[in-house]
Amino acid sequence: MNDKKTINTHTPLLTNIRNLLIQGRKNTVQAVNSIMVQTYWEIGRLIVEDEQHGDNRAKFGKRVLQTLSAELTKEFGKGFDTSNLRYMRKFYLTFPIRDAVRHELSWTHYRTLLKLKNELARQWYIDEAITQSWSARALERQISTLYYER
């Protein structure tokens, strides 16, 4: 009987610890996502800077990205196909000021946002995604239903 009383007494303690661990894990995921986004922005910057020093953009686009993709994939695993490297390049070109990149959004959010040509719409979706805590899937759904245009 005493054991049941002890368990009931510690239930708020257990709940508080669980909540702390859940929040800690959530913060960890957000921190990792933020660092990934910053890293991909830097990769995009390096690609653009290298491209600007090259003589032939067509050569760069095909050969260099394919070589980078093969080497990075071999060393770091998936996530570095030529398509994703092009997105990183476009990410830097679209957001040339690093501080303008919002840490609340994941790389998947940004890949979705990069498909938008309208800069005002893109900024509106960024603000809404952060304010409304949209997942990347929810953001994609809102864009596909032309939520901004309504």
Each predicted region: which residue ranges?
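Basic, low-complexity intrinsically disordered segments
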Residues: 1-150
